[in-house]
Amino acid sequence: MNLYDVIKKPVITESSMAQLEAGKYVFEVDTRAHKLLIKQAVEAAFEGVKVANVNTINVKPKAKRVGRYTGFTNKTKKAIITLTADSKAIELFAAEAE
């Protein structure tokens, strides 16, 4: 698996925004990725970032209905990335240059 295929997208929720102050970032990652691979992918994708800890959460599929047809959403995996104290911050929102 390529390192740039591991991280899918950042998770933007109220609780994940509250964790930014503590140096924790939440990403949706590939379900086959393990913690060491996630750490390597974050350090490769963002310059000057050093990862201290990786916590992972497997999110099970939810049942959904469209009319009389039932189905399930896809299972996903979330990773909570904790950065070291001397690490640069990850820029999730690029500021517009005026």
From Swiss-Prot:
InterPro entries xrefs? Nucleotide-bd_a/b_plait_sf, Ribosomal_uL23-like, Ribosomal_uL23/eL15/eS24_sf, Ribosomal_uL23_CS
Keyword rRNA-binding in record: yes
Q: Which domain of life is it from?
A: Bacteria
**Matching PROSITE patterns:** RIBOSOMAL_L23 (PS00050)
Signal peptide range equals none
Say yes or no: keyword rRNA-binding present. yes
Q: Name one Pfam family in it.
A: Ribosomal_L23
Q: What GO terms in the biological process aspect are recorded for it?
A: translation
Keywords for the protein's UniProt record, in alphabetical order: Ribonucleoprotein, Ribosomal protein, RNA-binding, rRNA-binding
SUBUNIT field: Part of the 50S ribosomal subunit. Contacts protein L29, and trigger factor when it is bound to the ribosome.
What is this protein's function per UniProt?
One of the early assembly proteins it binds 23S rRNA. One of the proteins that surrounds the polypeptide exit tunnel on the outside of the ribosome. Forms the main docking site for trigger factor binding to the ribosome.
NCBIfam families the record matches:
PRK05738.2-1, PRK05738.2-4
The entry's protein name is: Large ribosomal subunit protein uL23
